[in-house]
Regions:
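Short acidic (Asp/Glu) and glycine-rich catalytic loops that position anionic groups and cofactors
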Residues: 21-26, 54-62, 93-100, 119-128, ...
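Alpha-helix capping and helix-loop boundary segments enriched in small/acidic/polar residues
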Residues: 13-14, 30-42, 64-73, 102, ...
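C-terminal, non-catalytic "cap/extension" segments appended to globular domains
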Residues: 127, 131-245
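Auxiliary, metal-adjacent structural segments of Zn-dependent hydrolase domains
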Residues: 1-22
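Post-HExxH zinc-binding segment in Zn-dependent metallohydrolases
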Residues: 55-106, 185, 225
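N-terminal maturation segment of proteins
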Residues: 83, 96-128, 145-152, 171
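Active-site recognition of the HExxH zinc-binding catalytic motif
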Residues: 26-57, 78-79
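A glycine-rich phosphate-binding loop feature that marks nucleotide/adenosyl-phosphate handling sites
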Residues: 2-9, 69, 73, 98-101, ...
Length: 245
């Protein structure tokens, strides 16, 4: 096996290897009473990362191109695996509206995490303009920017103003400009899922992710035969709204 499982102090993460023959680490939360569903669900997400890390390290034919174009592409496979958590347990979803519900879920997930991404981008713009800011000043700036983004894009939908919830992700300080990988990852995930329908899952994932670290649109063309776009997600969500009441 190229994946080693370890307990996580936090919620969990995947740590990839940097050389062939080594193992990637899958870390997830296992409580005193054992693993609960949340820990398992996170573990399947991280497992998707580990599979990507293994394929893109071991199976890219030109090693200097090992990896993926950017973080969004590994998040996409993590989302694809995470959605299959119950299937891995032998539980089959028989809801006839599943496809439409998944389309709506993907669109909504993009909408939610895009707000956090915008906070991330604007916080770093603020930091560039205030290079000597203290931790306290940064905290107040993050909260102010979070409220501003909320009021602009979310207040009318949720019916409340000045909510600071979009400031919750510490990623934006620990891993600068990482959070935008999530909404783009959802778009990639959706396009790959559409492409995978009726095909051999394992064979296609191996083929797609063994392309290596190409430029994003070239990678997408090779993966699904079309460029990265929000259009498939928006179109599917619009169709779903005609069916799901």
């Amino acid at each position: 096996s190229r994946i080693k499982v370890e307990p996580a102090r936090g919620s969990g993460h995947a740590w990839g290897t940097e050389m062939k023959g080594d193992v990637s680490l899958l870390r997830t939360r296992i409580g005193a009473s054992g693993m609960d569903y949340k820990g398992y669900n996170i573990a399947t997400h991280e497992f998707g990362h580990n599979v990507e890390q293994t394929i893109t390290t071991e199976m890219v034919d030109y090693f200097p191109l090992y990896g993926v174009p950017n973080t969004a592409f590994t998040e996409a496979l993590a989302f694809i695996f995470q959605k299959r958590d119950l299937t891995l347990l032998g539980l089959q979803e028989k809801n006839p509206l599943k496809e439409h519900m998944m389309a709506l879920d993907n669109a909504w997930a993009c909408y939610e995490i895009m707000g956090v991404s915008l906070v991330d981008v604007n916080v770093w713009k603020w930091l560039y303009n205030h290079p000597h800011a203290s931790a306290g000043e940064l905290k107040e700036a993050v909260l102010s920017i979070a409220r501003e983004i909320w009021n602009r894009y979310y207040a009318d939908v949720f019916g409340s103003k000045d909510e600071p919830i979009l400031a919750i992700y510490s990623h934006m300080i620990e891993n600068p400009l990482y959070l935008s990988a999530y909404p783009i990852g959802h778009l990639i995930d959706f396009q790959i899922e559409q492409y995978l329908s009726g095909k051999d899952f394992a064979a296609e994932i191996m083929r797609i992710y063994s392309q290596g670290r190409l430029i994003p649109q070239l990678w997408m063309q090779g993966a699904v035969g079309s460029p990265l776009s929000a259009e498939p997600t928006l179109k599917a969500a619009e169709q779903a709204l005609q069916v799901v009441k």
